[in-house]
UniProtKB/Swiss-Prot annotation:
Its EC number is 2.4.1.-. Pathway: Protein modification; protein glycosylation. GO terms for cellular component: cytoplasm. Does not require a metal cofactor. Keywords: Cytoplasm, Glycosyltransferase, Transferase. It comes from the Bacteria. It comes from Actinobacillus pleuropneumoniae serotype 7 (strain AP76). GO terms for molecular function: UDP-glucosyltransferase activity. Pfam families: Glyco_trans_1_4. It is found in: Cytoplasm. This is Alpha-1,6-glucosyltransferase. Its main location: cytoplasm. The keyword Transferase applies. Belongs to the glycosyltransferase group 1 family.
């Protein structure tokens, strides 16, 4: 059954999708379109044919001076996109504007302060975790906040782990220098009894990342200032033993990461980091049962698959549209 609700929802971009947050926004667009909602990409930056084509089959609307919006149109805008917040504030006909804040620590790129957010004609905020909601409210944001957790695609799943050469997956995008520090400590402490291959997933497509993780025994995390930690969840879904930085500034207030699903190290604990990876290699080679891996897999299946995401999309956007999406079929 299609709903065919008579409104337009625009997800704002300034370039090709390339980050985890970008891909989450595209998941929102696809799911809303499955529900019969006219959701599109609003491209406000680089508008070359190559960039337009990077969104695949999703409809792209080019933002220019000729396009007109109604007061019922809805803009979904990332927290960092100051140009869109400023532009919308100056429009004669002001669309409904909703922030999709996927990282509270980058909110300063879009707004000067929490007070600036509260005073803006922004209607409400969507976030990917209760941690993000907590961090925004902690600093004084009073706008209504809804949570839609992203999902981990089913192609993130365990495969046969390579044993002749033990694969260790990582991304150095956020902590490039610290990977080099870690590797020095690791090579200084490792027994070198088993061959090890470090595989950098930075720059790979999401499907390529899934393949690397599925074959990797260990994922070493160089997360920093996370709102949820999507890459860590992908590694859990792939059956990796996750070791490293959680990415949370105050880990005790997050809803996902604890010692039952991985081994987490504090800032500067490079010796401990290397020791934990060395131990994990020995445990893997010896076939030791690892409850952290099983707990991580269980966490993903219970909370972060597409069925959970679609339920939250229906609930949150149904409230925004004032329409019962939860009892509709996609």
């Amino acid at each position: 059954m299609e709903n065919n609700i008579d409104l337009n929802v625009y997800f704002c971009f300034v370039n090709r999708p390339c980050t985890g947050g970008d891909f989450v926004n595209l998941d929102h667009v696809r799911t809303l379109r499955k529900l019969g909602i006219n959701a599109s990409i609003l491209l406000a930056g680089n508008q070359s044919e190559e960039i337009v084509n990077s969104f695949g089959s999703l409809p792209v609307v080019i933002l220019n001076e000729e396009i007109e919006f109604s007061s019922q149109d809805i803009f979904i805008v990332p927290e960092v996109m100051q140009v869109l917040y400023d532009l919308a504030s100056k429009m004669t006909v002001f669309p409904r504007m909703i922030m999709h804040n996927q990282n509270p620590f980058y909110t300063g790129y879009g707004f000067l302060s929490a007070q600036h957010i509260n005073e803006h004609r922004l209607e409400r905020i969507i976030v990917p975790s209760s941690y993000t909601k907590y961090k925004l409210q902690e600093i004084g944001v009073t706008k209504p906040i809804d949570i839609i957790h992203p999902y981990i695609p089913d192609y993130f799943k365990p495969a046969e782990k390579q044993r002749e050469v033990i694969q260790i997956a990582f991304s150095r995008r956020k902590r490039s220098a610290e990977f080099d520090i870690f590797k020095f400590y690791f090579l200084s402490l490792y027994s070198h009894k088993h061959s090890v291959n470090f595989v950098n997933i930075q720059g790979l497509t999401r499907e390529e990342v899934a393949k690397v993780m599925s074959e990797a025994a260990i994922f070493i995390s160089f997360a920093e200032r996370e709102s949820l930690g999507l890459m860590t969840l992908e590694a859990m879904a792939s059956g990796c033993h996750v070791i490293g930085f959680s990415g949370y500034t105050d880990i005790y207030n997050n809803e996902v990461i604890d010692d039952s699903v991985g081994d987490w190290i504090g800032e500067g604990e490079y010796t401990l980091f290397a020791q934990k990876v060395c131990q994990a290699i020995d445990d893997f080679v010896n076939g030791k049962m690892n409850p952290k891996i099983e707990n991580g897999l269980r966490l993903i299946e219970q909370r972060f698959r597409i069925r959970h995401f679609e339920q939250e999309v229906k609930r949150v956007y149904g409230n925004i549209f004032d329409y019962d999406l939860e009892n509709s079929r996609s």
